[in-house]
């Protein structure tokens, strides 16, 4: 064989490895569920109000600062900046640092919360930024509406750690919360799991692992704008790129790459095969999962991650519900009560969890 033949075989081998091992067969679409309540769409007539414009301005400024620090490889500054997203918010809840079996965390407890009723919350931030502090608006709200104690974990972040370390910390915290409340060992009466964005990814990965390990399952789960497919093959990754003011600056370079290169970038960055259900819960077995609510914006890049996950879960027989809002930024729920749509989203979360509250 001549040099060109060997080169051709090498290229073919690399293509096959990426296409069938790294990326896998993928999930393009699943049929819309026949359940009339899934999906639910929320929209408001007319132009966005002044509160929406103000939040957009805040998000653009915050995102610009964070992306600038990341380009400068100043992770400390990027993380400190991201942690200010809940700054200025008045909280009813109190916050107490704790150690969840070796995982740093904080308890978030609203007045009158029952500590035998608990929520494990996993923050977002692209696996790189974020902490319990950045997401106090969300965790405090969860405690208020459910009357539960919320355990917000400070899992290990990339790039200092591997993606599998993020996953392992979530599993460790889950074991711990089953037996421990804010005041020490205490029997658990009710458990929910929640997460947003990258934390939504970890949340959905966690409930599949809980099922496989036959552990006590949560009564329900809530995933806000979850990343479900790190092959980044959803159509909205590109189609909504210009509308997503929060994610576009961080995913601009990734979005410009061919799929072949993108798969190798994910393997290098995450140190995990992109099609591995551990990192791409969409590509795993979605049967026999607990009731799950997924919320997403129709203007965000991860819309199809949410949509495809819910449709596949429904097709697999799991009680999963999708709710979408028009013209919202990624994780708009964190801007409660500034945004009327955030208030609406929390009303829906409250109704969903109330429907799955333990007796």
Give the label of every model feature segment:
Residues 2-108, 359:
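A glycine/proline-hinged amphipathic helix-loop "lid/cap" segment
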Residues 5-25, 94-359:
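Alpha/beta-hydrolase superfamily serine-hydrolase fold, recognizing
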């Amino acid at each position: 064989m001549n040099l060109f033949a060997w080169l051709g075989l090498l290229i073919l081998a690399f293509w096959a490895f990426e296409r069938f091992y790294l990326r896998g067969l993928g999930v393009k679409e699943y049929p819309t569920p026949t359940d009339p309540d899934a999906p639910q769409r929320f929209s408001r007539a007319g132009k966005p109000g002044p509160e929406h414009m103000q939040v957009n301005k805040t998000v653009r400024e915050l995102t610009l600062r964070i992306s600038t620090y990341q380009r400068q490889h100043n992770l400390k500054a990027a993380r400190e900046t991201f942690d200010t997203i809940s700054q200025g918010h008045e909280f009813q809840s109190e916050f107490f640092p704790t150690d969840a079996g070796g995982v740093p965390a904080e308890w978030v407890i609203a007045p009158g919360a029952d500590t035998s009723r608990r929520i494990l919350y996993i923050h977002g931030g692209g696996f790189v930024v974020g902490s319990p502090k950045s997401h106090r608006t969300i965790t405090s709200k969860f405690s208020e509406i459910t009357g539960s104690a919320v355990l917000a974990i400070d899992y290990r972040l990339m790039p200092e750690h591997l993606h599998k370390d993020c996953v392992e910390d979530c599993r460790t915290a889950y074991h711990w919360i089953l037996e421990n409340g804010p005041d020490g060992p205490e029997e658990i009466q009710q458990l929910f799991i929640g997460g947003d964005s990258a934390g939504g990814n970890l949340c959905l990965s966690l409930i599949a692992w809980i099922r496989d390990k036959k552990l006590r399952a949560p009564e329900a789960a809530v995933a806000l704008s979850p990343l479900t497919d790190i092959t980044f093959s959803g159509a909205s990754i590109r189609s909504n790129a210009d509308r997503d003011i929060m994610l576009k600056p961080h995913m601009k370079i990734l979005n410009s790459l061919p799929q072949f290169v993108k798969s190798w970038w994910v393997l290098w960055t995450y140190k995990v095969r992109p099609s591995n259900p551990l990192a791409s819960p969409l590509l795993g077995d979605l049967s026999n999962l607990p009731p799950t609510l997924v919320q997403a914006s129709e203007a965000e890049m991860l819309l199809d991650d949410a949509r495809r996950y819910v449709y596949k879960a429904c097709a697999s027989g799991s009680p999963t519900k999708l709710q979408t809002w028009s013209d919202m930024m990624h994780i708009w729920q964190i801007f409660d009560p500034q945004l009327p749509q955030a208030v609406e989203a929390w009303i829906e979360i409250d109704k969903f969890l109330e429907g799955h509250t333990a007796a």
